[in-house]
Amino acid sequence: SKSLSSAMEYGVEQARTLLAGRAVLALTGAGISTDSGIPDYRGAGRVARHPLTFDDFMGSKQNQARYWARSYVGWSRVETAKPNPGHLALAQAEQSGRVFSIITQNVDGLHQKAGSKKVLELHGRVDQVLCTGCGDILSRPELDARIAQLNPEVNRSQDVEFTPDGDAEVEVGKS
């Protein structure tokens, strides 16, 4: 419609004025990674999801088993995801000095894969794992090798629904 078009043109002009000659801070969330195959929490047609909290994770061995089973199966989606034009555009804007830093809610590492250097990940990252017992940091491939050795019955190639945090809907105790 004409009013929507006018509003969009006005918004673009306002952004152009704001950005003229200045570097900006980019804030991103799950939406930037959906074109890379990583689902978001609240996209069209999605059922609202409530991620496991740290307290819930730490308070229950069953929650820990469920989390790691889902994460083990779903990790391949994140590991093989490629940056999309949005990630690449932000990396180019950073390299040219138009973006001075990126703050993201995402844990997928796609900004870094695109070439961005100054990225603050508010929710951490899934390619590194912190041991809550001793504080050691493991690479995700190292942890996956341990999980595979301890759980040879788990079928990573099963047809599953992938979720926003780089995990998958699976039932603990089933492969």
Language model: regions and residue ranges:
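Conserved catalytic core of sirtuin-type NAD+-dependent deacylases
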Residues: 1-175
